[in-house]
Amino acid sequence: MKKELRYGYTTGSCATAAAKAATYMLFNDEILKSIKIDLPIGKEIELDIFYIERKEGEVICGVRKDAGDDPDVTHNMIIYAKAEKSKEFLITGGEGIGVVTKKGLPLQVGDYAINPVPRKMIESEVKKVLPEGKNVKITIFAPEGKYIAKRTLNPKLGIIGGISILGTTGIVEPLSDEAYKKTIDLEISMASSESNEICLVFGNYGKNFTTLSSKMPLVTMGNYVGFALESACKHRIKKVYLVGQIGKMIKVAGGIFNTYSYIADARNEIFTAYLSLYGLDRGILEKVMSANTTEEILDLIEGKVGKDFFENLALRIKEKCTQYVKGCLEVEVEIFSLKKGHLAKTWSDFK
């Protein structure tokens, strides 16, 4: 029986709870052990206050980040908020919160990386406990953030010096496909501010194989070929170079745009269909159908098909992708093998 995965809370929810608790204690002679906050999705949650420090005119509270069963590098770190009496209402960042240095994010260059939804959450919840006629300055900080950020996408996104305060729902969905798609979309958005051409790869094999990263932004799309192409269209990318290992690319040749094996795994069938057009005998085709890997298939057909087989396969993949995006952008394709290296591509070498 499959274990039900546990949800967690975003850095945005933790920052909001810490800020609300600190503000409440700044104006009330009471120590809180926990505090309730409303989430953007209409739910109310209660988070424990892990740390409290009271000084004249300010209170600091800390909330421990619980990512649930999601493999989040910020799990267990403490998100702090300092509330100070002020002449105006202000939310800012401090130690361990990253600073934006590149365009393409929903924040201005120079801003602390407290995203719009968490910022709105903090403001809304703090004002619920803020006495009428009073104002407060909220500083969000996380001393561990400057170290943990190195294990996140922040350096690549141009967010330096710390983590981001994130979250659109307030909760972390464990191992979420949607969270990964949001990352892909964000990377493509960032890339679009630098270039109207990008290279899409499935993972580390593609990263290590291609030399295009020296010529244009490179985005890792995982198995989400279709989503990445749609995102590229949305962000007005003009040309996509799709580079992938034959095991993934053969699926795209069959019109499969989510290459997760549990979604669709017809590698052998698609290979067999294309090879049958080249007149291979039934015995070879049967071996192809029962092969364990695409690399094994390449060994089976070595010397039986020419370079033109892979060139035509690459053109077919290009055609499938162009049809998928309805011509909104140009697609070029390169196929490689882990054992045999470059197999085919649809573009001429760069000058």
Curated annotation (Swiss-Prot):
Catalysed reaction equations from the record: Co-precorrin-5B + S-adenosyl-L-methionine = Co-precorrin-6A + S-adenosyl-L-homocysteine
Gene that encodes the chain: cbiD
Superkingdom of origin organism: Bacteria
One Pfam family named in its UniProt record: CbiD
Organism: Thermosipho africanus (strain TCF52B)
UniProt KW Transcription keyword: no
GO molecular function, one term: cobalt-precorrin-5B C1-methyltransferase activity
Family to which the UniProt record says this protein belongs: Belongs to the CbiD family.
Biological pathway: Cofactor biosynthesis; adenosylcobalamin biosynthesis; cob(II)yrinate a,c-diamide from sirohydrochlorin (anaerobic route): step 6/10
Keyword list, A-Z: Cobalamin biosynthesis, Methyltransferase, S-adenosyl-L-methionine, Transferase
EC number assigned by the record: 2.1.1.195
Protein name, entry field: Cobalt-precorrin-5B C(1)-methyltransferase
